[in-house]
Amino acid sequence: MTTQPSKQLETFENPVQTRDYRIHMEIPEFTCLCPKTGQPDFARLTLDYIPDKKCIELKSLKLYIWSYRDEGAFHEAVTNRILDDLVAAMKPRFIRLTSKFYVRGGIFTNVVAEHRKKGWQPQPPVLLEVFEQQFNTHG
């Protein structure tokens, strides 16, 4: 059982390929290094995707995210690299990665990167009552 950082992303077959549904993940402890100063940068990543044939396996995602801990990377570059690797592994219908980096020099940086599978169109939204977002583990 691997407990070391790894760039290997694993997938499993989407159990419901006939329906568009959103998978939402929050990764509150992303860390990489500032390529200019070598100081750690911390971010909260939010991953939303609509799978096609494959879903990402959570432990491999955790080890993949962990692999950036000692790498120097600009916020924009690392967000897009992670998105590209997820797209290559899963080939989702749609995916959005939002990186919210904690304050550095008085500046917060948010980077949002998206990919949409060629030809895929979302279903029209069904407008119901608006509910506040509810999270499993926090407010």
Swiss-Prot record:
It catalyses: 7-aminomethyl-7-carbaguanine + 2 NADP(+) = 7-cyano-7-deazaguanine + 2 NADPH + 3 H(+). It is found in: Cytoplasm. The keyword Disulfide bond does not apply. SUPFAM superfamilies: Tetrahydrobiopterin biosynthesis enzymes-like. Keywords: Cytoplasm, NADP, Oxidoreductase, Queuosine biosynthesis. It is an enzyme of class 1 (oxidoreductase). Substrate binds at I56, E57, L58, H75, E76. One of its GO terms (biological process) is queuosine biosynthetic process. Signal peptide: none annotated. Belongs to the GTP cyclohydrolase I family. QueF type 1 subfamily. PANTHER family: NADPH-DEPENDENT 7-CYANO-7-DEAZAGUANINE REDUCTASE. This is NADPH-dependent 7-cyano-7-deazaguanine reductase.
